[in-house]
Amino acid sequence: MPADGYVGALDIGTSSVRALLFDTGAGQVPDVEVHLPYQPRVAADGTYETDAGRLFRLVGSAVDALLQEAGPRRRSRIRAMGVSTFWHGLVGADAGGKALTPLYLWADTRSWRESDELRRTLDPDAVHQRTGCLLHPTYWPAKLLWLKRGEPVLWRRRPRWLSFWDLVHQHLFGRAVTGVSMASGTGLLDLADCGWDGELLRLLEVGEEQLPELGESGQGLARQFAVRWPDLRNVPWVCAAGDGALANLGSNCVDPTQRALTVGTSGALRVLYRGMPKRVPEGLWCYRLDRDRVVVGGALSNGGNLYAWLTRTLAVELPRLEARLRRYRPVSTGLTFVPLLAGERSPGFASHATGSIAGLTQATTAADIVRAGLEATAIEFARVDQRLDQVLPGARRLVANGAGLLASPAWMQIMADAIGRPVAESKAREASSRGAAIFAAEHLGVLDGDKLRTEVGRTYRTAAAAHAAYRLQTARQEELYRLLIHDRALDAGDAILNVRPATGETK
């Protein structure tokens, strides 16, 4: 352990809160690890939310457990706290930090009509290039317009609009402060000047005073928490950064030569680097890690959640599934799967999208459907990878993270074959947590994340014949997408959905 002590890391996800301890060289302390699960509320109308107060109490319990597991000697040497959390969460709060609404998570799609209206009212490409975000239910503009319409009494109170960590920061330090990373995931931040976007605020009739203050860290815990956590009383808590950006930092994918492939509940493929893209590629997004580094990529709404749905719904025997999946030749199930059960983000951002399977027969087995679903998800990642090449060509490999993906050699090989690049296993199994620790250590000035080595395990190479088969299957999958989603939207007179057809052109 370096003499400099330790860094605590919180990882607040949409299904659990984790707390880990790292030394200031980003090495994980193996006997200190807290995992507290929770379940968001999900409903068929697009609801995807949780209770902010309950989640805050869970975060407090995670810190309690972290300090207990660390023990007196180690917890007294914690020099900073780093935080990774989900982008795009939105909660309304009063001046004292009391939540007035549920915490709306990224997958809540109830504002799809408002996102469509914003695309009619605004110049979608101009907004995309300014903010790095698309006009879609994922982001705050659509959710705020939806709340303005649906909650007029609340709206007239002019509440504060915060991400979850901004609310936590207010409770811990007395002020709602957000970092540019979390702000960049709202869809309201101008990426170039790192300030709130005036055009969007005027349209939504939201004042800057209703948004969190932009800052970097908090220090000096409020009395209640200073008594509860005396070892952290004067320790700096670095403002939370987006889990995706920190996953890149934590797996040492910090330049355009390496792309981070993450499959959690959802999925993402990202590039982290210093600078700004000349143009954000169509169908992708650009957020910030800090004022110097951006992360460009695409997020899939369907990743580990799709795999979980398949295995649960089809009642597959998991111990035998992996061996069966490995026996398939690429694209041999006879199925074409549009894997959009949780809607679509990148690259089409069709807020109304649903999943479909074509080619089912009486001979189709449960394993066939699972294999087709994994192949279809890999094809979606390949589509994102191709768009990244438009602005950041030359990636030599992908570094993969996510427990479900890393546990399945069959899925890893499918990824390598479909995307057409080597895919290496990341040895940083808790990449976002490690990224939070690195980010905090950078804040202390004791570590440079750019200089850390990428630790990888097995690398899966692309088989040329398999890649050719996936290229053909990509065309079939895009055609089914066009027929079922893009053309259906146009037939309904809803051309403003901004869905991309197979050619990648906007109609």
Residue positions per predicted region:
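N-terminal phosphate-binding loop and adjacent alpha-helix
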Residues: 33-75
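ATP-dependent carbohydrate kinase catalytic cores
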Residues: 187-291, 319, 323, 406-410, ...
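Conserved phosphate-binding loops in N-terminal lobes of ATP-dependent enzymes
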Residues: 18, 62-80, 144-145, 159-169
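Phosphate/pyrophosphate-binding loops at sites that engage ATP/ADP/AMP, CoA/4′-phosphopantetheine
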Residues: 59-79, 150-155, 198-208, 384-396
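Glycine/Thr-rich phosphate-binding loops that ligate phosphate moieties of nucleotide
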Residues: 1-33, 79-121, 153, 271-282, ...
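Gly/Ser/Thr-rich active-site cleft segment
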Residues: 12-14, 127-244, 307, 342, ...
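A polyampholytic, Gly/Pro-enriched intrinsically disordered region
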Residues: 55, 120-136, 231-236, 258-260, ...
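Active-site nucleophile and cofactor-binding loops and adjacent substrate-binding regions
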Residues: 50, 80-85, 104-107, 131-139, ...
